[in-house]
Amino acid sequence: MALKESQAELKLAADVVSTKIARAEAEDKLYGMKSIVFMQGWMPAEKEPELADIFDKYECAWETEDPDPSEYPDVPVKLKNNKLTNGLNMVTEMYSLPAYDGVDPNPLMAPFFILFYGLMMADMGYGLVMIAAALVAMKKIKPREGTLTFCQLLLWGGISTFIMGALTGGFFGDALVQIGGILGMPEGWGTLPCLFNPLDDAIYVLVGSMVLGLIHLNTGMVINVVQRVKRGDIAGAIWEEGALWVTMVGIVLFVLKIGNVAGVPVVLVIGCVMVLFGGTRSAKGFGKLTSIFGTLYNTLTGWFGDILSYSRIMALMLAGSVIAQVFNTIGAIANNLVVFFIIFLIGHALNFALNLLGCYVHDLRLQCLEYFGKFYKDGGRAFAPLRIKTKYYDTVEQ
């Protein structure tokens, strides 16, 4: 009981001690003598005017300069976010922060991550639960830092899940249809309009997933080309990404029987030659021969495997829908609303929890392995400035 009564004081003491520890650790990094103190560190470039205002209050000498390329591995990274991308910090930090000379992946990943999550979950009821949980948590708990990013990600995932559920006609599976059957409503009561049904249109959903995968992967390649051009590696962009694009166009033309000369798919042949040459540019002697086979194998199996990975979007959408309908059907067997809602609550709580985690893990895999593999340079370390960092209390400047 005594500990419970002193909980507020203990929390305040914990915040005070953690702040003092951070300050002491920072002081250990200072260089100085009796009358001189020397400090060196990193700061975001846009914060320089604020730094100038602070230093101008004191009689001290200071200067700032951009880091030299040789210093890039040591420069900390601070991601720039908005309300849409802040939740993706959770994903990026779980994988690895970008290198200083890399690109911020959050704005490039956000549309795809949110879209894919909604497609895999695809249920209006589950989406509403996620939205409500996120809004209540942000309103009542006032989360900060990691908890806040989780709530923001949950909110965007819930919005996407609701929209995709509206397109597939899912509201806790077919719960309304089963309730209508128990109440003796006419056949078809409770059936929601939909653009497509994952159970009836599984092939179309699978093809659509593959197309989204192609768009996703090619977006990553475009980002990599932009980075190559900025670095002056135009040849690399032509012989790697460019060669693959020519090959893709050649495959499409070959299937459509367009552009063949004397029965030979010219564009496809040119693309294949470019891929082979690009893969063997750096090899010498006998290594060129082995590189040819390695390039063919890696290109064919790599791209086939990458695109096939996106079939998980269809698989998770289908699995979640089927499990939801199974629990609804079991609950409706007794033809009693009380029994139905008991089984409904237990079954959907289990299905919701499994899908909430499963969709996140599989979406994470598509972003980190497939998408990031096309352009992402990781290895950055987080920018950690000296500041009052509390866990239980907010600080107010007076």
Task: Indicate where each model-derived feature is located.
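Intrinsically disordered, flexible peripheral segments
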Residues: 1-83
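Conserved, carboxylate-rich catalytic/transport cores that coordinate ions
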Residues: 49-398
